[in-house]
Each structure stands twice: as C-alpha cells, then as structure tokens.
Amino acid sequence: MSLFPVIVVFGLSFPPIFFKLLLSLAIFWLVRRMLVPTGIYDFVWHPALFNTALYCCLFYLISRLFV
C-alpha cells in the first residue's frame, strides 16, 4: 500500500499508482530514444517484447523507489 493520498484534479480522482505509471512512461521514452541510435534493436529478436519488458522493469524500479 502506498502512503500517498488519492489526488483529485478537476473533479477526477487518481490513485498514486497512476502517477508512477506516467513517470515510468516518461523515463521509458527517454531510455528508448537513447537506445534506438545505438543499434541495440538490431540485436533484439522481438522489439515490442523488449519494449514491454523494459517498461515493466522501469515501473518496478520506480514503484520500489517510492514505497
């Protein structure tokens, strides 16, 4: 459980995990933008699966960081 309260923006309530998801998505975009020019995707068998695993790992790290 998170200690952060539910955040209300313009009458819409958002759970704390929503902001963790958005933060991990922003970091995922940055990491992906850095990995594409390096050519690492040439060695990846399934890029969509790699992207999903990368996002899941980033989300796990962020959620462990803000517990």
Curated annotation (Swiss-Prot):
The chain crosses the membrane at residues 3-23, 43-63. Disulfide bonds: none annotated. It holds the Pfam family DUF1656. Keywords: Cell membrane, Membrane, Transmembrane, Transmembrane helix. InterPro entries: DUF1656. GO terms for cellular component: plasma membrane. It comes from the Bacteria. It is a multi-pass membrane protein. It is found in: Cell membrane. Belongs to the AaeX family. This is Protein AaeX. It comes from Salmonella gallinarum (strain 287/91 / NCTC 13346). The gene is aaeX.
